[in-house]
Amino acid sequence: MRLEGKSLKSDFLRFIIPSIIAQWVFSLYTMVDGIFVARGVSEVALTAVNISMPFTTGLFSISILFAVGNSTIVAIFLGQGEKQKANEVFTQNVVLLCILSVLITILVMIFLDPFARFLGATDHILPYARTYIGTIAPFSVVYILSYSFETLIKTDGYPKLATIYVTSGAVLNCILDYILVMVLHKGVWGAAFATGISQAAVILLYLWHFLGPKGTIRFSKFHLMPSEIGRQIRNGMSSGITEFSSGIIIFFFNQAILKYIGEYALVSYTIISYVNTIVVMSMAGIAQGTQPLISYYYGKNEPEKYKKLLKYGMAAAAAGSVAAVLICYVGAGSIVRLFLKESEASLIVYSVRVLRIFILSFLLAGLNVVLGGYFTSVEKAGFATMISLTRSLIALVISLVFLTAVFGGEAIWWAPLIAESCCLVLSAGLYQWYRKK
């Protein structure tokens, strides 16, 4: 791994800043689709993009599961001086992701309508959701490989290069979205196609790095290593769940909103889900930017350094969470108006109100995500998975069921804050137990 060696803090910043930017860019892919679809098609089409988000976040979560698990092992091998083993694990990861991507594409295309219905598409929304998902599915392989390559380039010691590549893809996506949706009027198909083509273009840049003379990590002859696959999945499970949590949250919220409030509130939640994704992915950027460094020093058996990196990560998450809440609270009206026209005055007022409730959960989310990432980095996969499952599934579902049963549908918007609070108690307890051991 290429480190500058000036100080631990400088290396920390050098890794997390590009990682956070990369997470923003990945989040903006779908958000940009939503903005152009809302402006160029309709609010119903925007809701269809939101309905489809669990699928796209599912693709990214698979990518992150394997990418983080793979980069953890690669970083440990590099720290131990085992470059050949690092290359073999990297190569195996790419082959497995290609096979998995093809299977996902085939299954989604065969069961396209039932899948869209399962995600929550009503008769009104189904045509748009079917088009969006059906266009994204053939690009599954580039979606999944894109983030995996981005993570491995950072592990290779080139975080700035990874940021340049992923930002180039985002710029291309914006340009293609504008041309296909606003100029050529290709609707949700145009938005989905623009995203897929942009991801494919970035893959070519990543391959140029791994096949070129710069990198330490290279393709090698494929060897099937089942034990390393299991180790990789265990290490990456927490990060994969963290990424998929935004999709899980969207799915459960969509179902609850349709049941307790009404279809109109789906538009409000679509806007909230974009904001939530950006903030949670920012926290994941801190965790994943720190991860290669923690794993590297863990492999070198230098606990004082990787414990200090955890402190840096927690401080960054706390500061980022407070900043996110302040920005979103003050700028709630401007955020909502990115998606809604002034003629939708009552919907704008409602969306601003519920957004300001939802964002309170950000104050705790970052701490949970960073602690989960730390446990992944030191190969305590069970702890990391417990944290991710609690915040994204167990505590959230219990909160949704309890709040709606006792206080009614509008209490839905408080569920994330309750879930994050419960999870933080668990996270702190696990860390205290691990530290004493």
Model-derived features: positions:
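Transmembrane helix-bundle signature of multi-pass secondary active exporters and lipid flippases
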Residues: 20-72, 136-143, 230, 234-297, ...
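Short runs within selected transmembrane alpha-helices of multi-pass transporters and secretion channels
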Residues: 67, 135-154, 162-173, 191-204, ...
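Small-residue-rich hydrophobic transmembrane alpha-helices
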Residues: 46-106, 143-162, 268-332, 365-387
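Membrane-helix interface/capping residues of multi-pass secondary transporters
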Residues: 34, 43-46, 83, 112, ...
